[in-house]
Amino acid sequence: MPADYSSTARALALPISPLETPSSPDQHVERPPWSRRISSNVRRANNSASPYSNQPTTSFKDQILRKAEKLQRKFVSTWQKLSPLQKCLAVGAAVLNIILIALFLVYQHQIFASLAPFAERWRDMRGGWMILWAMTFVAAFPPLIGYSSTITIAGFVYGVPKGWAIVASATVAGSLCSFLASRTILSSYVHRLVGKDKRFEALALTLKHDGIKILCMIRLCPLPYSLSNAAVATFPTVHPLNYALATALVTPKLFIHVFIGSRLGSLAGDEEMDASTKLINYASIIIGAGLGATVGYVIYQRTMARAKELEIEELEAANGDVAAGRRVAAEYSDANNDDAALMNDDDISLWDNEDAQTGYTDFVDEDEADVFASGDLDEEGNIGGKGKTAGT
């Protein structure tokens, strides 16, 4: 029996589970694939699947139908928000535009004939081009309007080569001066004017990555001329000389407006023009206007798509930095726990006294007296003996 008690005590003293060993520094836990950032190469490879991809995932016809439905819903929602007075004014403006277009088509010859002498006197005036140059220059400052009209007048009065040279030089100079003024003396007004415009907020992010390229795209977008000058001035990463360079690089787009003006001048100056020539001029005007609007719209869509793509990349980079910081903090915490375990295992107390009486332990030394040799049985025997003695 004592031997059985000793073996049982030794068995109970054994640990139930193996001791944890400190993690090896060579072992690294591999992160799951979903936690990794998408590289730029993979993103470009899968760009067609992105909602902001420049490549259409549907047919051109479906895109046109979708755009038409979107415009219809927007028109209906806007119309429902108008008050009765606003609806009456909107209907009146639409009717007035139809009447003006009809009058222009009917009396176009008389209108152009009355404008022809005026254009001729302006063209023959000494220094007359400076008036047009000044008009284009002033139209660059916010919130003035009329920039497109001045370009068309340049083509109407001076034709394609000379008219383009006048408005191109005035555009570059006016844009630069408007940029500097919007960043200095007009800064508070500009921030109130365009500071909360979502279009320009989206374009601000792209300038951090694409530089002169995105500046050229902004200049090609069909945005209000004076407002775009003011908005770009609020972007701190844009240098004035870079902005002037981008404006100069996109001045060839002015040929479209100048060409339309020159065709109008031809219709006004030649009274004996036959029907076929007039038809060609009108077709040229319509094609030029449609081409300019289409190019501007496509560039605007691609610019905004690029802005959304860069915004997603910025968010991914920020989320990746946060995840990396949390992972490093977790690894640091695990390392501290491992060091503490090692210190506890190797801890040697300098105050141990082998002669002192130790406390309770589950381990039994065979050399020591068997603690179960005398115990409850002897005590019960003694009690039983005393009982018998008392009974006798």
UniProtKB/Swiss-Prot annotation:
Residues in the Lumenal compartment per record: 1-87, 148-163, 262-278
Cytoplasmic side: 109-126, 187-240, 300-392
Residues with attached carbohydrate: 46
Ranges for region VTT domain: 155-264
Principal subcellular localisation of the protein: Golgi
Keywords: Glycoprotein, Golgi apparatus, Membrane, Transmembrane, Transmembrane helix
Taxonomy, superkingdom: Eukaryota
Gene Ontology CC annotations of this record: Golgi membrane
Cysteines paired by S-S bonds: none
Sequence intervals crossing the membrane: 88-108, 127-147, 164-186, 241-261, 279-299
GO biological process, one term: mitotic spindle elongation
Subcellular location: Golgi apparatus membrane
Membrane topology classification: Multi-pass membrane protein
Disordered: annotated segments: 14-37
Pfam family, one: VTT_dom
Domain notes: The VTT domain was previously called the SNARE-assoc domain. As there is no evidence that this domain associates with SNARE proteins, it was renamed as VMP1, TMEM41, and TVP38 (VTT) domain.
Family from the record: Belongs to the TVP38/TMEM64 family.
Its biological purpose: Golgi membrane protein involved in vesicular trafficking and spindle migration.
Protein name: Golgi apparatus membrane protein tvp38
